[in-house]
Design a protein with these regions (language model features):
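Bacterial Sec-dependent N-terminal signal peptides
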Residues: 1-24
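Flexible, glycine- and charge-enriched loops at secondary-structure boundaries
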Residues: 6, 34-37, 73-77
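A domain-start/cap signature at the N-terminus of enzymes
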Residues: 18-57
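Extracytoplasmic/secreted envelope proteins and their assembly/folding machinery
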Residues: 41, 58, 81-85
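Short, flexible loop/turn elements at secondary-structure junctions
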Residues: 47, 63-65, 105
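Beta-sheet entry/capping signal
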Residues: 56-58, 97-98
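Structural cue for short, hydrophobic secondary-structure segments
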Residues: 60-63, 100
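Active-site machinery of serine-nucleophile hydrolases
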Residues: 67-120
């Protein structure tokens, strides 16, 4: 299996693992590399609605803090997926998509160095 196919298979498995841990909805992940820094972009579809001209988009920074505790540096997250689950239980089915943007990180060291200041 060549490297590209292996990488694609690995990314699909990672996204499926992430989606299985969400309370509701699904996430697509993309990685952007700029110079020596990487940034993960997560597109969260809480209600899996069709994206159309009525869809509202919310852009949130610090995506590593939004969904799963294992992604955070301190072991706690906002779990916004659970908030959307509560909305679904109260019959709120919003046509919304969350664009979650991670802080820029420089990989390849024992600890990835962040460039949070670059976000501001």
């Amino acid at each position: 299996m060549n490297k590209a196919k292996f990488l694609l298979l690995f990314l699909i498995m990672q996204v499926n693992h992430l989606n299985s841990q969400l309370a509701i909805g699904s996430i697509e992940e993309f990685f952007i590399e700029h110079n020596a820094y990487d940034r993960r972009i997560q597109i969260y579809y809480p209600f899996n609605n069709q994206v159309d001209q009525n869809t509202k988009f919310v852009i949130m920074n610090d995506a590593e803090e939004l969904f799963l505790e294992e992604d955070t540096w301190r072991g706690k997250s906002w779990r916004i997926d659970k908030t959307f689950q509560d909305l679904a239980k109260s019959s709120e089915n919003l046509n919304i998509v969350v664009i979650a943007v991670n802080s820029a990180k420089k990989p390849g060291k024992i600890l990835n160095s962040t460039r949070r200041y670059a976000d501001y």
